[in-house]
Amino acid sequence: MAGPHLKVFFVVAEAVPYAKVGGLADVAGALPKALARMGHDVRLVLPRYSSVDEARFKLSARAEFAVTYRGQRTQVGLRETLGGNGIPVYFIESPPHFHRPTIYSQPDDLDRFAFFALAALEAPRAIGWQPDVVHAHDWHSALAVARLRATRAGPRPAAVLTMHNVQYQGNFGPEWPGQAIPDAGTLGLDRVLAGGGNHSMLALGVANADAVNTVSETYAREILTPEYGYGMERLLQSRGDRLCGIINGIDYQELDPATDPALPVHYSADRIAPRARNKAALQRRAGLPEKTDVPVLGMVTRLADQKGLDILARALPRVLDEMDVQFVLLGTGQPEYHRLMREVADRHKDKAAFVEGFDPA
């Protein structure tokens, strides 16, 4: 029997097709569409980065409102477009915060995304829409969860926090909340620290969420250990009754090889022969010799210790020296792995290619 239809508000730092750095964008682009197909009223908010093209995405002005941060009232705009399945997608317009060369890795990321989280909570009120659930993702929007619990008297939306990677926490110094956030004392930082948490946005979100979710049942167990909890394992253990893991899915509409516009040639489970032409196209695009009898190993990943890049960096040269294979890596991440992958590609020009960045094609 179907449950009640809910109003769900996603608060995210990135979502395809508007802004993408990692897997968070894929989930934030696909999950709202799946929920909408189930009959829920789903809406999405993210920052209006300079890379979000107004003409391409047909952005229109929806509202203006003020956000208080670091003792100042800042006027922001709310832009709107319709995404997949007719889902309203909103963008917080504040050029000083979001018109930057990159989405992340700015020296004031903590302030940028704290401002975004506070602005995101004001957006529903500005458009006259009251969500039943606010669903924040990772540290960038975790403050919205803490703020929601702290400032709403009486009935309020349920607060859900999904952690895609516990290693990235949005850490701050002990003095920062009082300097930056109005009524910071209501956020329960003392409760966070007493529960084994640390000074971080993610810890504030975990401590205040009605439900805490992560990307698989296995990862939900792993983050309870010192090896994978990155200093948050005690706090996560204390929220064990509210913690679960739900494995990420994929968007079958976007990633169907029978219709995917990014593929040079379409194929299906019943017709796989055309894949050979896609392989040749990948070899050309990567600058590798077109060899029909050589397997091509492809890898799309964030270049980080957590993804096993340290193991890959040691093993790959031997594989390429001893086996007749080609290897293509697509991704971004830690600078040392960029350097190592470039060195491997330079030493094995006919066998290895490193494509820096993310490209859905």
Model-derived regions, located:
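Catalytic cores of nucleotide-sugar-dependent glycosyltransferases that transfer UDP/GDP/TDP-activated
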Residues: 1-361
